[in-house]
C-alpha cells in the first residue's frame, strides 16, 4: 500500500475521532433549557412580585420542582468563573477577555425572601445557575451550580408522583402565579 494512502487513512481516522469527541462532549453537558425542562413541574419567567417591604422585585425564573420552589439567577457565561460567597465581584476569564459582575448571591437571597413572603406554605430556595460553557473554579459556594448539578440535585419524579405533587402544590402555585406580573 502506498504511503500517501496510509497517510490519508490515518488523517481521516484522526478527524473522525476528533468529531466523535466533540459530539460526546456536547451531549454530556446539559444546557440551561434542558436542565429547566428536566427539573420543572412548571415555571414562570421574567416577572415581578411584591417583596414584602412595600416594593417589588424582579424574578428571572421561578421554577416549581418536586422539592418546592426554586428561584434562579441565570448566568450564561463562557470561560473560567471565579466565585466566592464573600467576594463582592465575581470574575470571568475567557481567553483574553476578562470581566466581572457583582456577586449575585445577595440579590438572590432578597428574591428568595420575596417568594417566601408570598408563598409561606411552600419550601423555597435560590440558585445562581451558570451555563454549560462556564467552568466554576474551586468548590462553588452553596447556591451556585451548573446545569448537570441542577438536574442531579432536583430530580424529576415519576409520572404518578408528579401528578400527586402537582395536585398538592396547585393551589399554592396558582396563588403565587396570580401575584406575579410582567415588568
Regions found by a protein language model. Give the residues of each.
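Surface-exposed interaction regions that form or flank ligand-binding interfaces
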Residues: 1-57, 63-69, 76-78, 92-183
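A broadly used, surface-exposed interaction patch
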Residues: 84-92
Amino acid at each position: 500500500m502506498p504511503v500517501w494512502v496510509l497517510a490519508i487513512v490515518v488523517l481521516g481516522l484522526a478527524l473522525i475521532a476528533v468529531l466523535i469527541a466533540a459530539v460526546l462532549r456536547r451531549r454530556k453537558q446539559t444546557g440551561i433549557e434542558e436542565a429547566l425542562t428536566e427539573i420543572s413541574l412548571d415555571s414562570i419567567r421574567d416577572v415581578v412580585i411584591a417583596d414584602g417591604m412595600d416594593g417589588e422585585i424582579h424574578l428571572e425564573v421561578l421554577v416549581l420542582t418536586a422539592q418546592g420552589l426554586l428561584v434562579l439567577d441565570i448566568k450564561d457565561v463562557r470561560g473560567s468563573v471565579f466565585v466566592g460567597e464573600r467576594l463582592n465581584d465575581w470574575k470571568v476569564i475567557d481567553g483574553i477577555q476578562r470581566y466581572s459582575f457583582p456577586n449575585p448571591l445577595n440579590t438572590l437571597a432578597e428574591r428568595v425572601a420575596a417568594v417566601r413572603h408570598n408563598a409561606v406554605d411552600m419550601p423555597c430556595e435560590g440558585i445562581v445557575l451558570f451555563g454549560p460553557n462556564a467552568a466554576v473554579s474551586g468548590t462553588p459556594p452553596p447556591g451556585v451550580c451548573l446545569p448537570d448539578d441542577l438536574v442531579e440535585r432536583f430530580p424529576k419524579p415519576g409520572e404518578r408522583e408528579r401528578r400527586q405533587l402537582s395536585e398538592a402544590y396547585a393551589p399554592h402555585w396558582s396563588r403565587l402565579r396570580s401575584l406575579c406580573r410582567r415588568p
